[in-house]
Amino acid sequence: MTEHHNSDPRLDTTREIRAPHGTTLRAKSWLTEAPLRMLMNNLDPDVAEHPHALVVYGGIGRAARDWKCYDKIVEVLERLEDDQTLLVQSGKPVGVFPTHKNAPRVLIANSNLVPHWANWEHFNELDKEGLMMYGQMTAGSWIYIGSQGIVQGTYETFVAIAKKHFQGEANGKWVLTGGLGGMGGAQPLAATMAGFSMIAVECDESRIDYRLRTGYVDRKATSIDEAMAMIKESDTPISVGLLGNAADVFPELVERNITPDVVTDQTSAHDPLNGYLPQGWTMEKAAQERTIDEAKVVKAAKQSMAIQVQAMLDLQYRGAATVDYGNNIRQMALEEGVENAFDFPGFVPAYIRPLFCEGVGPFRWAALSGDPEDIYKTDQKVKELIPDNPHLHNWLDMARERIQFQGLPARICWVGLKDRERLGQAFNEMVKNGELKAPVVIGRDHLDSGSVASPNRETEGMMDGSDAVSDWPLLNALLNTAGGATWVSLHHGGGVGMGFSQHSGMVICCDGSEDASQRISRVLHNDPATGVMRHADAGYDIAKQCAKEQKLDLPMLNEELRRL
């Protein structure tokens, strides 16, 4: 055990965590080694935003409640038997119970509050008392893979924007955005992959430098003029990290009559206390004020967000394709008096929902061996099994060429109900026959078709008005537990902040066994199928057609499906 050198039990600057590589186990089987390695991988300094504070990404999205809890989780996973299940309550290991070999080895509930109390004020009180932890989406569920985790979804969105607004031609066009954190850091690479140039405004210079080192951003600028010159002088799409505050830069562009082609934002606006720097403040002032007067910080941050959103609306009025990228900044601005904050759409209803209707979403896998060759072999297997999707092949080629692995090698690849189970079975077979050096884990973001209720993001503007119904992610978590996922998580507040979302995650370990094959056939079919079910239930024709093709049994719709 390491002695803590700070009164905050969540902070220990002496710790450096990296997942083990190779085939030597610290746990009793791969089913418990897998969550152990992925927990540790979440805190790898090449992966996490602030690993010494257990913060993985997204403001204060943590992997464990404090270092004592982290150490105890590791200790339990090392001794856990294959007929036991560990329960984790907001980053704290609270119980080990007898189950069976096909049950999940870990069940996780993070940040869940009774709805009346589901707000940042109450959460922050509990967090200060050490009674809760913000799990974000993949931070507290141990399946974060670095910025790659959102690159493809962002790339798909930018491709869709190009098709909708620019006849599919992004070259010569540029995107304005804010935020280069764990999620926002994916934007510059995704933009240039899709053919756009980008100026990404970031107030923390260390984040720009990190994205430069890892190849996610091409250049750094300290003024609007410098950034604009870089874009104009480049013959090919280029991304620029602009040091500044989005609440200053966005309105300055309006004043100077500079209109980007596309405008969005991925600052951590979902968390006004910890995630957004108020206009005119330094990082140091914000850190100090948080310890003195939290309400003052929140108010100043939300007022600054209102200024930024007003500028986004002004740029939209001038012709920029403007879209909310799911950080709840419109809601924050609305609460500060910007009455038309929702005049620009969220990215899911605007561009992603047709994919969700077919259960297509951010399928991801990581090589527990730590060997990049295992990922390259699985890339090839995906191409073999899905031969007639040139867009997907292009993504895999670009990902191999341009995305640096962070921590354990991993890949993200948007596929749906028709393909997830097939890919999982193929990967399991590759482990069984020794093509891969060690097992792989398959998971996904909580941003998926059947696993989230978030009225300002994934379920915004559902055609039947069921945006806020959160039975669906609960059913998804229950079904993945029943199906035998290796670990299952149920969270609140990810992406958009407290009170605005509920969502679930699952990870399954492909260890090459017959038992794993049977679990894969259940979990990797059922998980995306809940998304098709949810969208079919809401009335989407694409989802109904997919349900019919995939022979889903949806009692209230079966008669209608037979007539299709």
Swiss-Prot record:
Signal peptide: none annotated. Pathway: Amino-acid degradation; L-histidine degradation into L-glutamate; N-formimidoyl-L-glutamate from L-histidine: step 2/3. It comes from the Bacteria. PANTHER family: UROCANATE HYDRATASE. NAD(+) binds at residues 58-59, 136, 182-184, 202, 207, 245-246, 266-270, 276-277, 325, 495. Belongs to the urocanase family. GO terms for cellular component: cytoplasm. The active site is at C413. The keyword NAD applies. Its cofactor is NAD(+). Binds 1 NAD(+) per subunit. Gene3D superfamilies: Urocanase like domains, Urocanase superfamily. This is Urocanate hydratase. Catalyzes the conversion of urocanate to 4-imidazolone-5-propionate. The gene is hutU.
